[in-house]
């Protein structure tokens, strides 16, 4: 009887029983009246008369009047008090239930180690992401983002080479930049070591050159000197300080992203917990590009 724990189910069951009882009572009353009643009363002077059958000048039945009045009162309550002013919805109730569950989930798994986080992220990826990005996370031959390279220097190099689209920033789509691989690697090293919160690069010797190229090639025009992408308190371009972190991924999961093929939808409706959002980039960061 778990379904009785939901007050909507209880209300529906009670309403169904009331309707059933009233239907049986009214049906039996009408059947009895049809069997025992005799024609009586005055016919309406201007009423309908068809084949000798006329219309009595009777008042509207009390039951009809009561039904009409109850319907009007219910409609007034529904539109002005019950909904939408009280703002109840099944989606809202679902979100509250998921929020409560996420709090229990966070408390239960708050002390996860690195390996457990990676395993959790892998589970989330296989269920929600692998359909488009592939089991290996390589993007199914370009149909989706190659997540093996995302969040790393290789991902920045791909963006420099091919450009970026689909996040609807004020600066528009980032075009591909005509840089050779060495210069692209230098910029990627600088971004990962000095701008991104990751603060780590495989090529520390390229940081200084990468900084010069970052400023001279026009990257600061959209992303700013600090890489935050802000100009006069407006979000002009991607915030590179969050690249490779859960905050960057959270933004994509919340807003979705247009790709070369199709459109990645927003996953906001999934109501991922903070721990799940943290676990997903941990798994992605654990993946190693084939070049390595």
From Swiss-Prot:
The Cytochrome c domain, residue ranges: 116-195, 205-288
Required co-factors: heme c
Xref: SUPFAM superfamilies: Cytochrome c
Pathway entry: Energy metabolism; oxidative phosphorylation
Record-level GO cellular component terms: plasma membrane
Function noted in UniProt: C-type cytochrome. Part of the cbb3-type cytochrome c oxidase complex. CcoP subunit is required for transferring electrons from donor cytochrome c via its heme groups to CcoO subunit. From there, electrons are shuttled to the catalytic binuclear center of CcoN subunit where oxygen reduction takes place. The complex also functions as a proton pump.
Family indicated by similarity: Belongs to the CcoP / FixP family.
Complexes and interactors: Component of the cbb3-type cytochrome c oxidase at least composed of CcoN, CcoO, CcoQ and CcoP.
GO MF, any single term: electron transfer activity
Gene3D superfamilies tied to this protein: 6.10.280.130, Cytochrome c-like domain
Localization (cell): Cell inner membrane
Protein name as catalogued: Cbb3-type cytochrome c oxidase subunit CcoP
Pfam family, one: Cytochrome_CBB3
Cofactor binding comment, as recorded: Binds 2 heme C groups per subunit.
Keyword line: Cell inner membrane, Cell membrane, Electron transport, Heme, Hydrogen ion transport, Ion transport, Iron, Membrane, Metal-binding, Oxidoreductase, Repeat, Respiratory chain, Transmembrane, Transmembrane helix, Transport
Residues at which heme c 1 binds: 129, 132-133, 264
Main location: membrane
Binding site for heme c 2: 174, 219, 222-223
Keyword Cell inner membrane: yes
Membrane topology: Multi-pass membrane protein
TM stretches of this protein: 11-31, 62-82
GO terms, biological process: oxidative phosphorylation; proton transmembrane transport
Keyword rRNA processing: no
Entry-linked InterPro entries: CcoP_N, CcoP_N_sf, Cyt_c-like_dom, Cyt_c-like_dom_sf, Cyt_c_oxidase_cbb3_su3, Cytochrome_c_Oxidase_Subunit
